[in-house]
Amino acid sequence: MVNLREIKGRINSTKSTKQITKAMQMVSSSKLRRAEQNAKAYVPYMEKIQDVVGAIASGTKDSGHPMLTARPVKKTAYLVIGSDRGLAGAYNSSILRQVQRTIDERHKSKDEYVILAIGRVVRDYFVKRDHNVISDVVGLPDQPTFADIKEIARNAVGMFIDGTYDQLYMYYNHFVSAIANEVTEKKLLPLTDLAPPSSNASYEFEPSGEAILEVLLPQYAESLVYGALLDGKASEHASRMTAMKNATDNASDLISDLSLQYNRARQAAITQEITEIVGGAAALE
């Protein structure tokens, strides 16, 4: 016969788990709202700096700046943005799977590429598989500031300028909605596909467009990294909220099934006791 105490223990254990996942769902929901606001608030800045950079670059075609110039590719860098923690559904696995597939398709040797990792899960994945992780940052807050990733962003740009690698791709999860995100690949460097300014505004540059590009181009590339991080953080919180909601729903279903099983077992035990009592009474007559 089914052990009633064991079933009761499983019910209580599942209820405790449900309380935890429900709390995590609510926390992630709160973090998502703020992360989504941060990502949206950053868009106007990105659009404006892109306009300015595009305007300067279109007027200085022969600047020869290394960030604007394509060169023969001997080594490629992949900047991969993930999270420090799990329990976020396919948030990390989907992006890691895509990056790994890309590496397998594009490269025959590990000497042809390097990894820059944002997030402990990303770093540990590539280190465990013996990929060359040349820079990483972990322990980011839920609402990161530019200062949190300034070092790795500047390293990424600086190593391209210095010739450590010849092109840089960035991978992150683009936030679509609270229930959807998509793995996005963006070629970060060289900046060979800068669009002309979207507005008809004209700019006058002092001391010169080339001098301003020298300062603005690294800042622009670094801001793209930060914008992708904000986008990725919104996706992370959304994925974790969805995962915890699914876990909570599954716990509720399991509690219902176990409760039904418990009641049936209890009813069977009572029926058996009555049968034994009746049988014993009949034997005494």
UniProtKB/Swiss-Prot annotation:
Location in or out of the cell: Cell membrane
Keywords: ATP synthesis, Cell membrane, CF(1), Hydrogen ion transport, Ion transport, Membrane, Transport
Cysteine pairs bridged by disulfides in the record: none
Origin: domain of life: Bacteria
PROSITE patterns tied to this protein: ATPASE_GAMMA (PS00153)
InterPro entries attached to this UniProt entry: ATP_synth_F1_ATPase_gsu, ATP_synth_F1_gsu, ATP_synth_F1_gsu_CS
Biological processes annotated in GO: proton motive force-driven plasma membrane ATP synthesis
SUPFAM superfamilies per record: ATP synthase (F1-ATPase), gamma subunit
Chief location: membrane
A GO MF term: proton-transporting ATP synthase activity, rotational mechanism
Function: Produces ATP from ADP in the presence of a proton gradient across the membrane. The gamma chain is believed to be important in regulating ATPase activity and the flow of protons through the CF(0) complex.
Family listed: Belongs to the ATPase gamma chain family.
Protein name as annotated: ATP synthase gamma chain
